[in-house]
Amino acid sequence: MKHEWNLCPSIFFSIFHICLSVQTNYGPYFFDNGPGSTNGNMALLSLSEDTPVGAYIYALNGSDPDGDPVTFGLTFEPGSKRYFAVDPDNGNVTLIEELDREKQDEIEVIVSISDGINKVSEKVRVLVTDANDESPGFLNTPYIVTVPEDTPPGSSIFKIEAVDKDTGSGGSITYIIQEMHGSKFTIDRHSGVLRIKAGVSLDFEKSRTHFVSVLAKDGGGKLRGKNQVFTSTTTVTINVEDVQDSPPVFVGTPYYGYVYEDTTMGSEVLTVKAYDGDRGNPNTIYYSIVNGSDGAFTINNATGGITVIKTPDELKKEVYELKIQVSEITPEGDKVAHAFTVATVRVVDLNNHPPTFYGENGPQNRFELTMYEHPPEGEILRGLKITVNDSDQGANAKFNLRLVGPGGIFRVVPQTVLNEAQVTIIVENSAGIDYEKFHLFTFKLLAIEVNTPEKFSSTADITIHLLDINDNVPRFSSEYYIARIPENSPGGSNVVAATATDLDSGLWGEIKYSIYGPGSDPFLIHPSTGIIYTQPWASLDAEVTSKYNFYVKAEDTEGKYSLAEVFVTVLDINDHSPEFSENIQEKTLIIGTPVKIEATDHDAEEPNNIVDYSIMQADPSNVFDIDQSTGEIKLKSYIRSLDIIQNITRNKDCKWSVVVQAKDRGSPSFSTTAVVKIDVTEETLLHKGPMAAFLMQSKDNPMKALGVLAGVMAIMVVITIFISTAMFWRNKKSNRVMPLRRIIKRRKNDHPPRTARTEWLKFKKSNNSADKFTIQEMESGPKNENRNNNYQGIPVPPRAPCPPPPPRLMPKVSKTERSLPTVSGSLTPKIIDQQMNERVPSASAALVSELKQMLEKKNAGSSMSFY
């Protein structure tokens, strides 16, 4: 019972606590951790705009007093872009949309926390901080500026504006001119004001437009964790406006003037000269002396002439430096531009005369002369009467002479003068004085003092006019001319124009043409134009003469000439028909061997003279063929005997008349026909003997047979005469023709008998015909002479005379090749047996045998000489 009582208070308190809890359930709340916190309710959260999408940016954090679990939520105002998302369980917030501070610098978001019963919501603002993600941008482009050229240096001419949407250093802009070297402009780095550089001016006459490239650069800043600088560029076009801004310009500076002791007051000492720098619309020039004159000089305001207004004795200084001002006067009379120079005036009492040139009539600074071209080198131009004089004395009167102009043509003598001299101009280069190159020469003769500080000088203009002479030979345009003309060209046809030129003028440049040479007969030439044409009677024929060669002469009026060679080729045309040879009327054709006909075309060139052959008519037509190119006529290949011919034709005697055509290849083509009588025979008919073969071969040409026969007879007569002459000899004393005597010299009787051994014999050839052959002993001894008809010794018993020596041996011929001539001139070899009788031994062998017999008889008898 006690135990039950103890449980009652516990149950009571539990029920009370539950009831109390139901009645007092508290809502959850966010932790407020302050600025910079990464968890809490996102109050005062700042987020850089370069935060990448998907990045974790915050953690919502809170608690429930009752200890219940909480969840988190995140919403946006209706119509707003959702930038964040939250995990309801852990409160992690993620960026889901790219931030851009320049478009939205703060984001309103509603965060909530709930314990399942109670939900607490808070509206917070998330600040978007800047990142340097924008480039500078120029405003109001393009930039075109017009600036007067007289704008002072350093002046502001334009302001360039650029903006950068970034904040802080990323939004600050610095301006820079690119390519500063050589630029006439500068820019304020912070304001963007464009100015003309100090010390630099614009000039419309030099440059009308300038292009300036300007760079705008921000101050840099962080972007995604890295320092980033952005730039932009633009071009400023500056047009320079022309104004009257160019000052006058002096010419001929420096200026020097002299006042001599004899100078009179009011004399002009020197003249200064200036012109307006603005050439387009120049203003009037006004001269004035600013200072330095000390009242001794004045200047002509319009001409610039400076005049001395005191006498030389009143001048207190030796040198006056006159500061001369020149001004431009506007049409309104205002002085708008100025320029300054210094004119030096020296007061001297010596050397007050410059060199002066004189002609025949006094002082003169221009001389002229007319002369022929190409004078000899070293010749003096006597037509120029020039004297030079310096009235000063001593060293002040010494000066040099010099020719100024084309160099190396003339030279002046003397080159150094004291007081006065006669000026001589001499030819130095005759070839350079050429009328065809220059009609006149212009020189300046300069005289300049040597040892004076003033270096006074004077000039004289020398003009030399040239006259032409005939110094040029006519020249042909070519050394040779090649022409071609058809052979049928009528008389008077143009062949070629041989033109020449003569550089001389007038009559000396006129040319007359002529031709000469062995080949010029058919041609004429126009004496003025050089056109070569054929004689009216000329009939050119390439078959007679196809090439002509002659000379053309170009001659001027004084006989100077040049030559050119002319080559004329006469072009062949087809004007001849082929002509058959005379021996084609009758032909003998051996079976297996062709006969040839031949025609000649007298045209000079191919293809006009190429002949083609053809058979126009033959009955029957199946017997003969002809070679188109050679003209050889032969039987058809299947005809090999007379029997075949007689079987296929009606003509049993094998004789035909064939009409043959010869046609050339010219255009137009010409042709000729001829009738050839052909007698067909076989080769076996020629074996009946040499004479029969020869007569058969010569059947077509009987004159050939007669000629051969006459030749053989003439050869036999010549041989007979030669042999007869050799056997007889003329005795000079008796003037009779007698047989040749042979003299034999013997040894004395005391010698042993001689034998007929031929080694002791020696033939000796003599120039004397009476001693044609002699045999003498080798040993010396008393001569045994034969005195011919005057010898009175014992005569030898008579004996028969020696027969004449036989003819020379002919070679033994067993077989000789005989040839059968054909129409074409070719030879057909034929083998003919011919037996030749052997000849007797030669004459020399017979003579030796006879001499040996005589020697043997004399050895037995006496020591006399035998005839």
Swiss-Prot record:
It is a single-pass membrane protein. Residues 777-825 are annotated as: Disordered. The keyword Calcium applies. Residues 729-867 are cytoplasmic. It comes from the Eukaryota. Residues 22-707 are extracellular. One of its GO terms (molecular function) is calcium ion binding. Gene3D superfamilies: Cadherins (2.60.40.60). Residues 1-21 form the signal peptide. One of its GO terms (biological process) is homophilic cell adhesion via plasma membrane adhesion molecules. Residues 795-809 have a biased composition (Pro residues). Residues 39-138, 139-250, 251-357, 363-476, 477-580, 572-692 form the Cadherin domain. Keywords: Calcium, Cell adhesion, Membrane, Receptor, Repeat, Signal, Transmembrane, Transmembrane helix. GO terms for cellular component: cell-cell junction; plasma membrane. Expressed in photoreceptor cells of the outer nuclear layer of the retina and in the pinal gland. It is found in: Membrane. The chain crosses the membrane at residues 708-728. Potential calcium-dependent cell-adhesion protein. This is Cadherin-related family member 1. The lineage of its organism: Eukaryota, Metazoa, Chordata, Craniata, Vertebrata.
